[in-house]
Regions:
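Rossmann-fold scaffold of SDR-type NAD(P)-dependent oxidoreductases
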Residues: 8, 118-130, 153, 205-208, ...
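N-terminal Rossmann NAD(P)H-binding glycine-rich loop of SDR-like oxidoreductase domains
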Residues: 11, 15-21
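Catalytic loop of short-chain dehydrogenase/reductase
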Residues: 130-131, 137-150, 155, 166-176, ...
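Conserved internal alpha-helix within the Rossmann fold of NAD(P)-dependent oxidoreductases
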Residues: 156-161, 203, 317
Length: 361
């Protein structure tokens, strides 16, 4: 069955291959491109980025026209493939909080009637944006370079995830009364461009790395200090995020009668959406393997074994996500843990390799 995926960081390497394979399988894909300020002016959040050499519909509130980002040419090329009509491209720079907020509102607006998210569900979000500046030895690295690793590989993906998860709350019209204002002016009605239903995320995937494992410390990875530290911090952050999601979903689950009432009063609400009482999100961390990408194309001081292509990595990871993600036969790794005589904590994030093997935190 066709699904809706959101790939954050899709202009090259793993993210681009995710987008390509998902489109070929007939899925709907929302993909993001990060653009330097000097090559892309910020568009209206309600407008997707334009196709190459195409002038978008002008934003009546802004005279500025977004330009085609040259660093995303391979991503834009996918719009010309047989299923390219299923691709929506938005702007997001995970190292910039304003960009993250603008991107989140762009996603929210895709939930309005006629938008690709009008069903109120994103089946899978893949937070893939990342950076590797080599060498990144802790004993030699600059403050700026270390901070860049943390902002791009850790803080950005987690904050982006947090903002996207906030979409599970419906956007309500302004309150009809306010204790802080004596104005008698009527309340501004909800804009028809704003969605009235929440958007549920079923599975959230973070692209992690074996370098971030604190159990299997890889001391031979000279020059990976900053990168490894950023991935280790990402792992801890996403584990806490999963625990927080689980606690919140348990504390606010409405009664069955309340859920039925909501569905009756809002027929557009999906039965498995957050508002109907099932806002569980499965959180996964994935090590994609030693993938031959532009980011990994650096001269290392050690031999990397088992290098695989992006095509192989993504093909395998799609299988892992299908099995371990929301509704999978091994959702959250519960079944595989039981087979090993272990108990998987409910709602916990789990860490997997592209081969579907459990990896230690």
């Amino acid at each position: 069955m066709p699904q809706t995926w959101l790939i954050v960081g899709a202009t090259r390497g793993i993210g681009l291959e995710f987008t390509s394979q998902l489109l070929s399988l007939g899925h709907t894909v929302i993909a993001t491109a990060r653009s330097p300020t000097h090559s892309l002016l910020t568009p209206s959040p309600s407008l997707p980025l334009p196709l190459p050499n195409q002038t978008p519909n002008p934003d009546p509130h802004s005279p500025r026209t977004p330009k085609f980002p040259s660093n995303a040419s391979n991503l834009w090329a996918l719009t010309g493939t047989p299923n390219g009509h299923n691709l929506t491209i938005l702007e997001c720079d995970v190292s910039d909080e304003k960009s993250i907020k603008s991107f989140t509102e762009s996603v929210r607006k895709l939930g309005r009637k006629g938008g690709v998210l009008e069903g109120g569900v994103i089946d899978v979000v893949v937070l893939n944006a990342g950076v590797l500046e080599y060498p990144g030895r802790v004993s030699e690295i600059s403050f700026t370079s270390f901070a860049h690793h943390l902002h791009t590989n850790t803080i950005g993906p987690l904050i982006t995830a947090s903002h996207l998860l906030s979409l599970s709350s419906p956007l309500l019209p302004p309150s009809s009364s306010s204790s802080t204002s004596s104005s008698t002016q009527p309340t501004t009605p909800l804009s028809p461009l704003q969605p009235t239903i929440p958007i549920q995320i079923k599975t959230m995937v973070f692209t992690s790395s074996d370098s971030g494992s604190t159990t299997n410390f890889r001391s031979f990875e000279d020059g990976f200090g900053a990168y490894a530290a950023s991935k280790a911090a990402l792992n801890q952050g996403l584990r806490h995020l999963a625990a927080e999601i689980h606690r919140k979903s348990r504390s606010k689950a409405p009664s069955t009668s309340a859920s039925i009432s909501n569905l009756i009063t809002n027929p557009n609400l999906q039965p498995n959406s957050a508002e109907s009482g099932n806002d569980k999100t499965v959180v996964l961390a994935l090590h994609p393997g030693e993938v031959s990408t532009d980011m990994a194309n650096v001269a290392l001081d050690w031999e990397v074994e088992g290098i695989i292509s992006p095509q192989e990595s993504i093909s395998c990871m799609l299988k892992v996500i299908r099995e371990k993600g929301y509704g999978g036969q091994d959702e959250g790794g519960v079944v595989s843990a039981r087979s090993e005589g272990k108990r998987e904590e409910e709602g916990a994030a789990t860490f997997w390799t592209w081969e579907g093997k459990r990896y230690p935190w």
